[in-house]
């Protein structure tokens, strides 16, 4: 088994965070009273709204900014954001769906082997940091992709990046390094 051989690694996307604007002021009290599946957090000045399909939780501010979390793909995130905008339109707001952007993607990938973390950290010192007293994983940052990887000794890798393509590239880029330090 060598690092160059094509190994099919399953990258499971667990969370996609996206943002969009409604281009109108939103009355949070009206959303709280008339909307479905809503939690009004008056002390913070926001409303949480949940959709069942796709399973998304949205944080809505009176300025018209909406953050959606919980989607499992970029397409599902956009679909859920548009459904949310439609729900707000049905409540009587003049919503215009604009400035949609995927801001964060969280994914999990399992390597087919275990990893020696101290050796991995020593070999990749400027990018990797390992504090076993604080956290059981190595934190590895790839600045060019704006991705952060949490590498565990079991071979599980949690990747956070700005989009799905960056997450996939980060896993491809890290594979030869973790392969060198396998148990």
Swiss-Prot record:
Tissue specificity comment: Present in the brain, heart, liver and gizzard.
Major location (coarse): cytoplasm
Keywords: Cytoplasm, DNA-binding, Nucleus, Transcription, Transcription regulation
Compartment(s) where it occurs, according to its Swiss-Prot or TrEMBL record: Cytoplasm; Nucleus
GO biological process: acrosome assembly; DNA-templated transcription initiation; dTTP biosynthetic process; spermatid nucleus differentiation
Domain of life: Eukaryota
Stored Gene3D superfamilies: TATA-Binding Protein (3.30.310.10)
Span of the signal peptide: none
GO terms, molecular function: general transcription initiation factor activity; RNA polymerase II core promoter sequence-specific DNA binding; RNA polymerase II general transcription initiation factor activity
Gene Ontology, cellular component aspect: cytoplasm; male germ cell nucleus; transcription factor TFIIA complex
The family this protein is said to belong to: Belongs to the TBP family.
Purpose of the protein: Part of a specialized transcription system that mediates the transcription of most ribosomal proteins through the 5'-TCT-3' motif which is a core promoter element at these genes. Seems to also mediate the transcription of NF1. Does not bind the TATA box.
Self-association state and partner proteins as the record states: Binds TFIIA and TFIIB.
The protein, known as: TATA box-binding protein-like 1
Organism of derivation: Gallus gallus (Chicken)
